[in-house]
Amino acid sequence: MEAWYKVATPRKEVRQGRSFNPDEFAIHLEQVIAGTAPEDYREPEKFFSRTCFTRALREHAGMVLRRLSGETVNTAPVMTLITQFGGGKTHTLAALYHLATNGEKAAEYSGVAELLAEAGIKTVPAARVAAFVGNAWDPQDGRETPWIDVARQLAGNEGVRELGDMAKTTAPGTEALTRVFKAADRPVLLLFDEVLNFLNRHRSMADQFHAFIQNLTVATTGTTQGTAVISLPRSQVEMTDWDMQWQ
């Protein structure tokens, strides 16, 4: 039997005896999108070269790609990722982000060709992606509410106009959200992470945010090329009593 180091080459950090920074093991979706995450998470080629396509990741990514391709069988308009702390929720969202924003080019990345074959589609559809990361999000000029932020990411100023005049205080209805999807003029992928963290920090917005998510679910169901993926914790360590009631 060959020595293990001849069969599996250790990563460069191990070979060099470099001390590990625990922060490097935590992925933050907002940093991936902003381009400030560590290179292994920020660069899609490196990200996929070091990603293990588990059954859960293959299933979720396959369903999302099929939906963005216009398929309605073996897929879903809204998906929830519910795992224990450290179970890979944000890693899955980052994988979906890299796939959707790179489109056809993503087929060149490690493991993606096999993913496409398993999903029964030929290419990765390029999509408009909007991400909401609850532990990073706070109101700012131009994104006074989560739905304004999402609309702006999908369709710029036109998307915000489609929400109507009440968007700064009131969650949009399904018709307004459908107009935003049409203004995006591409398949639409919506990623939600750390939602409960946001609600804990902005409890005055909880009712309106809940209405937004409900209406978004209905609007997404009404399109054949749009999907929303929402991560939620399973572990009580990550939730307060109020979180569990809201969830």
Predicted regions and their residues:
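Walker A/P-loop-proximal flanking segment of P-loop NTPase domains
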Residues: 1-87, 94, 99-100, 247
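Flexible phosphate/Mg2+-sensing switch loops adjacent to catalytic phosphate-binding sites
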Residues: 75-78, 97-133, 160-171
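ATP-binding Walker
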Residues: 87-88, 106
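Conserved phosphate-binding/catalytic loops and adjacent sensor/switch elements of nucleotide-binding enzymes
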Residues: 92, 136-151
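Conserved P-loop NTPase catalytic core
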Residues: 118-119, 125-140, 218-222, 227-247
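Conserved P-loop NTPase "ATPase switch" module shared by AAA+ and STAND
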Residues: 133, 180-206
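Substrate-gripping "pore-loop 1 plus following alpha2 helix"
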Residues: 173, 203-215, 242-246
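Substrate-engagement module of ASCE P-loop NTPases
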Residues: 176-181, 209-229
